[in-house]
């Protein structure tokens, strides 16, 4: 049964990727109203006879959401049936299920009643946390037989706090990026890294969309520098742990690609493939940070038990 759970968790994690990218695609292509204000039906029909491009994108996103939802429900059921004694696994499974339901309801509410750009930006953030929960559940299932060799990693208190802080800050950066999409501020600034490279900052002349765009760039730049500094420190301090060592190097690579593809969005005038890769890299990056948070929680718990004994 453990093997079945592992396979199902891998499939669920992989399927979360097109779910997240599908949501970004809906926004990028302006397909949010592809089915009108009808949900779960499309234009009041199960399968409309005339399907436009926008309708196809929206229907595909709903279909993927439904499939992933069924996978997570089944995975949660099996976890409860077979591993209810493992509190970490049960918590992650029910967290993933709850977040999946929440993000689906927010998506449905956006279709039926409409939502502000700020509320819609939250939709992607919740989906990202849901992905992190499924990803961690998969890792936890593989850790049952100690194949990842993470049980002996001790993360000191200072580094744990830094991991929590950068993870929380990443969510803020993700929210600002989602706000860029939902307010159509992607090309509010035609240059990079400044809004207009051949002039002074001129921030007093920025309109709302330029403030949103440049605010996101500033936040992303800080995140990149922070990740570089933290990676150097973690690699030096935990070089004896191969999993931790390589995980941080992968994380640094992901944030580097994230910044690169963010710039390419401007240079290619919002090329769709580039924009989707931009969403993919931040998803994987946050997944890695979630892994570090998981290890930090575990290290704190071991430290607490050690002090008590």
UniProtKB/Swiss-Prot annotation:
| Residue positions binding heme o | 61, 123
Where this protein primarily resides, as one coarse class?
membrane
Q: List the disulfide bonds.
A: 35-42, 189-195
Instruction: Give me the residues that bind heme b, please.
Output: 216, 278
Topological domains on the Cytoplasmic side lie at 1-6, 84-88, 145-159, 233-247, 293-309
Its GO CC terms are:
plasma membrane
The biological pathway it contributes to is: Porphyrin-containing compound metabolism; heme A biosynthesis; heme A from heme O: step 1/1
Region forming the signal peptide: none
Active-site residues from the entry: 58
According to the UniProt topology, which residue ranges lie Extracellular? 28-62, 110-123, 181-211, 269-271
Q: Name the InterPro entries for this protein.
A: COX15/CtaA_fam, COX15/CtaA_HemeA_synthase, HemeA_Synthase_type1
| Membrane-crossing segments per the record | 7-27, 63-83, 89-109, 124-144, 160-180, 212-232, 248-268, 272-292
Q: Which UniProt keywords apply?
A: Cell membrane, Disulfide bond, Heme biosynthesis, Iron, Membrane, Metal-binding, Oxidoreductase, Transmembrane, Transmembrane helix
Q: Name one Pfam family in it.
A: COX15-CtaA
Q: Note what the entry says on domains.
A: The N-half (TM1-TM4) and C-half (TM5-TM8) domains are connected by an intracellular loop. Each domain is formed from four-helix bundles and they align in a pseudo twofold symmetry manner. The N-half domain is the substrate-heme O binding domain and the C-half domain is the cofactor heme B binding domain.
Which HAMAP family does the entry mention? HemeA_synth_type1
Q: Which PANTHER family match?
A: HEME A SYNTHASE (PTHR35457:SF1)
Q: How does it assemble?
A: Interacts with CtaB.
Q: According to its UniProt record, which protein family does this protein belong to?
A: Belongs to the COX15/CtaA family. Type 1 subfamily.
Q: What is this protein called?
A: Heme A synthase
